């Protein structure tokens, strides 16, 4: 299972999102550091809408997602951009 698929699965199981996008942005970081050739899964963006985030602060939402994905971050996921929202909240995507 790819890292993208693993992240999607974990987010679905934990937050039951109404909308979810997991985007591999690694290609945008080619050459930024040794070993970043743009072909891996080092930089990911998560866009998620879930009722689980209702009443949570932005920081708490980020913390919940980062805590869930800590094993992936510890295993080499270099960057994780998170765009969480509750249903009915405006998004830029």
Swiss-Prot record:
Gene Ontology terms: biological process: iron-sulfur cluster assembly
Source organism per UniProt: Sinorhizobium sp
Entry similarity comment: Belongs to the BolA/IbaG family.
Protein name per Swiss-Prot or TrEMBL: Uncharacterized protein in cobS 5'region
